[in-house]
Amino acid sequence: MIRLAKSSDKYHILKFCKNTFSWGDYIQDVWDHWLSEGNLLVIEKTNPIGVCHAVFSKNQVWIEGIRINSDFKRQHLASNLISKVESLAIQKQIPISLMLIDTENTPSLLMAQNLGYKINQTWKFYSLSPRENPSYEISYEKIIQNNNLSHYVKSWRWIPLDNDTISSLNSKNCIVQSKIEKDPAIAILGDSEHFEKTLIVTLFAGSKNNTMNIISFLQNFGFEKKYQRLQILTKETLPEFRDLEHKISFHLMQKLLS
């Protein structure tokens, strides 16, 4: 049975969400946030054995945090959770479903493709250590809709950069550009809604010099604002830079629901 999660499910869910990745898992850090946001679904057989979270917006549903107890693998439980979210999205007349999958997670990629998802884009996740670095030249500027700027990342959710979203970002003055030469680099800055002292950056790389210039700014910005973590999401391979480390790459998977 699939149902909305409740507070008492947390104990059962976290028991099998400890070693999902080599470094552990993040579900314990976001559970309370997701529960309060709503649309946190569990699948149960006596006790909860699977979970996922859905975020519905005007034109898309974002599916995240799919976890299945390893004792119940190969029973299509993840597929059932995804199909449930899709049915809710269709009821809301939402046309697109999106999710993020590690490029090396072949079983999950095959499952998504069997459900009709296709690779829409590939993104790379870099971490950057905050450090005093005053050698940069950037400007806070507004942007306009551009086919090359398709999405930005808000708390690890990919949001389409439509006119309304761009207008909101412009009004918050959270877009920086490096234009020291042709082919500018653009970064959209945002605080994580789930992790303290974490800056999430969507970076649209430009020329090598512009890109390194904006990374220098981000490093110094993180130092000045006392961030503990700088997380950069980009579609490009970034140049080598001190304290910049590529962590993982993801496929942005998309399915048209109508």
Task: Place the predicted regions along the sequence by residue.
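Conserved acetyl-CoA-binding loop-helix of GNAT-fold acetyltransferases
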Residues: 68, 74-88, 110, 114, ...
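Conserved acetyl-CoA binding element of GNAT-fold acetyltransferases
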Residues: 60-70, 194-208
